[in-house]
Amino acid sequence: MKRMIRSHGRKTECQMTGAGERRGSAVGALICGSGTRRGSGANERRDSDVGPIAHSSGTRRGSANETSACTRTDHQKADIGLWFMFLVFGLCSWLAMRYRAQ
């Protein structure tokens, strides 16, 4: 199941172009982000590398070309921001419920 979600997120990320890319980044961050964060740490380290290593690993995994590797880094930035906002929202709501109960 995890593998399916991860591959689906990559596929939508590669196919999105133009106007759909803005809309897809938030949705893709939820779909693909959950898969990449749960995935192995080695996978993230490989994506963070810049140069032929990152591109070769991307083509081996089935990504189309270098542009998908470039959008992946932008996508990860949006993903981190989204998770941070979600974490802050969850913390605030938890604190509000806790103090309301007292």
Swiss-Prot record:
Membrane side Extracellular: residue ranges: 1-79
UniProt keyword annotation of Membrane present: yes
Topology of this chain in the membrane: Single-pass membrane protein
Region (Disordered), start-end ranges: 1-21, 33-71
Residues carrying a glycan: 65
Principal location: host cell
Cell compartments where the protein resides: Host membrane
Record's keyword annotation contains Membrane: yes
Membrane-traversing stretches: 80-97
Family classification: Belongs to the HHV-5 UL15A protein family.
Official protein name in the record: Uncharacterized protein UL15A
Organism: Human cytomegalovirus (strain Merlin) (HHV-5)
Lineage of producing organism: Viruses, Duplodnaviria, Heunggongvirae, Peploviricota, Herviviricetes
